[in-house]
Amino acid sequence: MRGRLSVVTVGCKANFADSAAILTHAARAGFEVVEGGAPADVLVINSCTVTRRADRDCRALARRLRREHPGAVLVMTGCFAETTPEARAKVPEVNHWLGIREPSSSLPRLLRSLAGDAASSGEELSDFAADRLLGHSRVFLKVQDGCDAACAYCVVPKARGAGRSLPRREVVE
């Protein structure tokens, strides 16, 4: 099905870096990347779950995109995608859920599947890889993701996992 792919990003700078990487993966898989929310065959919501309002906004965004693009494949990734099955069940509009901790292997595979490519290239791309500007004058360089702190009020470690960083050599390159 190759075609057009659009990413709508909700949340923090880490999500914007993740969205840039998603767009890089999509372009490499042969998709035409279009502006967030523009008509597309595949719509990706890079979601946030840091507050109850963010959860509500992501659910509303999924409903709106489904209403506006009834034939599109709707993919939800980001922190909201890491929430409980009960929370996911409240968003039946989503066709595919992609956890934030799995994009390096799952995203290329999902994109190839949506594009109709039966053969897997075995490609695994860095979760941190991005060469898209997302309308900015600078490329996002995410050198660390996740968090090792266990603050009682914060959902980031649960959603993004333990802290992990790019090797210093890769950051410099």
Q: Residue ranges of each PLM-predicted region?
A:
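Proteins enriched for Cys/Gly/acidic motifs involved in redox and nucleic-acid/cofactor modification
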Residues: 1-173
